Amino acid sequence: ALRDVLDTLIVIPNDRLLQISDKDIKASEAYLKSDEILSNGVKGISGLITQPGVINVDFADVKTILKDAGNAVLGIGRSTGEQRAPNAAQAAISSPLLEATMDGAEGVLITITGSEDLKLQEINEAARVITEKADDNAEIIFGHTIDETLGDAGEVTVVAAGFGPRPNRRVKESSEFENN
């Protein structure tokens, strides 16, 4: 099975399109919407690594969260207004296209993006919205980038992993443990 050879699997089921689409939407339009969401997801993950930031996230951070992590979820939210970052965070973790919630995730990667005028309080509240859903002992990696092209919008990208079966997670042999 595919899961047996992957570190992490993010599933976005096509049948969830019914939840976010008008009941009269044409199938071809629904699949275009699905493709757009997948494209945004790939751009979101690659943007985590390639977009320079105030607090950078690099490939090693992504690897830390996704290595042998089993199932993962990806959420991208965007919002405008006074509480744009917290609202974008809520949108990122509430997407009806996610196969699972991020509740109990053992690893979470968060990137908050906004213009130069994004307030520290907004960033802190957005991070709190997300981390409250994770496991109490989760590894949280945080990034903050500035993108003036967003105007007054804030965008939050979340990758949460480390729940569900993890077939590739290697268990240390007894000889590998250090004697203390």
Predicted regions and their residues:
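Tubulin/FtsZ superfamily GTPase core signature
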Residues: 1-180
